[in-house]
Amino acid sequence: MLFARNAELLVTMDEERREISGGGFVVRDGWIDAVGPSEMFAVEPGAAVLELGGHIVIPGLVNTHHHLYQTLTRAVPAAQNANLFGWLKTLYPIWARMGPDAIYTSALVGMAELLLSGCTTISDHLYMFPNGARLDDEVRAAQEIGVRFHASRGSMSLGESQGGLPPDRVVEREPAILRDCVRVIEQFHDPKPGSMLRVVVAPCSPFSVSAGLMRESVDLARSHGVQLHTHLAETLDEELFCQQQFGRRPVAYAEELGWSGPDVWFAHMVHVNAHEIPLLAQTGCGLAHCPSSNMRLASGIAPIMDYRRAGVKVGLGVDGSASNDGNHMLLEARQAMLLARLKLAEDERQAHASGAEFAGAVQMTAREALELATLGGAAVLGRKDIGAIAPGMCADFVAYKLDRLAFAGARSDPLAALLFCAPQQPDVVVVNGRVLVQDGQLTMVDLPPLIERHNRISREMING
């Protein structure tokens, strides 16, 4: 049993969105048992006590889209100023040099960085398996470091010789892809409430595999009760390619392939029209909004407030560590808030320029941004047991000291300070009732030798 108490502000994100001054809660066997003002609770004999005076406490953040292996190729000079397709063409040959240790080590580095940003649930999309690499390498890292993990078994089957972008040596044969999807589901997927590990079927995109594999992936995932994930509508180049190749827009093409329903979520969804947003809401699809990556690659601004008004499930993703190039979920929530405000201003400018009436939509608030990073991500991942500090929820929570320089002058609204002020690292991170960050330090990983090994692998890959 763990008793967390005396938080300066406990942000529950429960159904009533309670924010409790002097709040506390009880954790039993990895679950939140009770929540309220700290004076409500008596400390039971033998219980561990976590004193959180002077801290703001929030639910653990949820990352709905990532490529952890890309921590190995951050800020590569030739890829720094490229758009998506040029960026991929530059990095694919480097990624082709990865092996099992590269996948494992990069996953540990990315997960460590995410934990130190307040992220407790990570969904990663691994779609390259060169030189004997397997999804198992990431799973091993997640189990060692202690994060809650959704492992997306990605795939690419169309190499350069078939009109695709990746080198032929990194694509797989489609029967082998399907067999391995079944293997990892049967070996790793845990559908139970409180699960620490789930598996997702996730072709890289509808343009990097055949239409047949997209359809077979739907059948396989639904027969095994797992979710489906892919990239969609990220760039204008993609939209043009889809219309030229298939005679329809990306969303319509995905729906034609069976990629529609509450078990489906897409990464990005930047370039959609007014007719497609209600369709996504009606079918229950979710999306991972990746603001930093979309800005980094000049892909565009996703209409997040339009999605929210329509009732589409929206979570946040830091996306590839080589298209971000960081792993900071609190920063991603801040970026989402600021980019939504920029989109609002641009929509207003365009309306005035065309003489159209502007509805005067409101700006995204700090509390809405935090909701995207918690409950929004939980909904996208099909989870009802994470995203809030409430009885019956998983004991995943994060605490930040408020007496630091970055929050000076911002104590009147500590929650807003988290989003408006410079993003900070947490002092405490707990996942499944287990302390993984204490006093700002990781408890399960020795960082210096890990970083040294990671940098050595990175140099070897980049230098060839």
Q: Where do the model's predicted regions map?
A:
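C-terminal cap of metal-dependent C-N hydrolases
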Residues: 13, 394-451
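Divalent metal-coordination and catalytic microenvironments
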Residues: 7, 25, 30, 54, ...
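Metal-coordinating catalytic core of metallo-dependent amide/deamination hydrolases
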Residues: 133-271, 275
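Active-site gating loops and adjacent loop-to-helix segments of metal-dependent hydrolytic enzymes
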Residues: 72-103, 158-174, 236-263, 283-286, ...
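His/Asp/Glu-enriched, well-ordered alpha-helical/loop segment
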Residues: 256-263, 305-404, 420
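N-terminal metal-binding scaffold of metallo-dependent hydrolase/deaminase domains
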Residues: 1-44, 55-56
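Alpha-helical scaffold segments that flank or form the walls of functional sites
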Residues: 26, 74-125, 129-148, 178-194, ...
